[in-house]
Amino acid sequence: RVGTMRARDFVALVARGAAAETELAVLERILSQAAMAQSTYADPEWAKEDTQLADALLEGARSENAARSIVFTQALAGIKLHDASRAFFQELLETSSDAGLRWKALTALIADGSLADVTGPEAAGAAMTAVAEELKRDNTATGYQASLKALAAVNTEDNKRAVWDEIVAGELGNRDLESKLAGLTFVGADELLPSAEFFDVAEKIWSAQSNEIALTTVTGLFPRWDVSQETLDRADEFLSRDLAGGLRRAVTEQRDRLARALRNRAVDRG
């Protein structure tokens, strides 16, 4: 995070050594850190082509130790899929009876666009059908929240716009909001999400919603997916306004994370 090690070197270190970690809580944390390093702190051109983390996670997901397998599978579902991980999740959907893992697999495949051999509106329709079927299998409160995330993860412009607008409207309860935000910003959504628009709606969101909902919404919609100097400049301009204290703190925190990502990408490029 502080730029003393290139992100790609950290990813390589975790990919080589994760299999040796025996403490599950530690393993879960370092896998999450490696995924963050690859998606946020590494040079995007390198990250797009590198598969060492995905390969290591896939190997761990195939472990005979059920607890370790779950940790690796959950991490694998949160990064960009490649051919082998795509096939793994397709098989998992066909064979697993674990509802939580099935939702992870389904969401990853939906976001990847590989749930069915269709694209565009047909892909969205296939996702809705698959989610409805899965919800019949897991008709629980947890299953319902997972279904909201999965549907929000459909990576089409129309879907992302609809989910964004629904979130900005401020009529969702906290749990539904969190699930839809997680799906909205799931892997593969970066180029489909607005950036500058956040700074036009943030003050309205803050003034119109309860403190808890407003904080969740502002934090979730801040355009951290657009790691660029332009977005950083927009954030600085926004922070120069006369803002409510809570809104200023929330945006400042996200602005600083964005600045860190910019610095670390520069370090990673060498």
Enumerate the predicted regions with their spans.
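Long, ordered, helix-rich scaffold segments
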Residues: 1-270
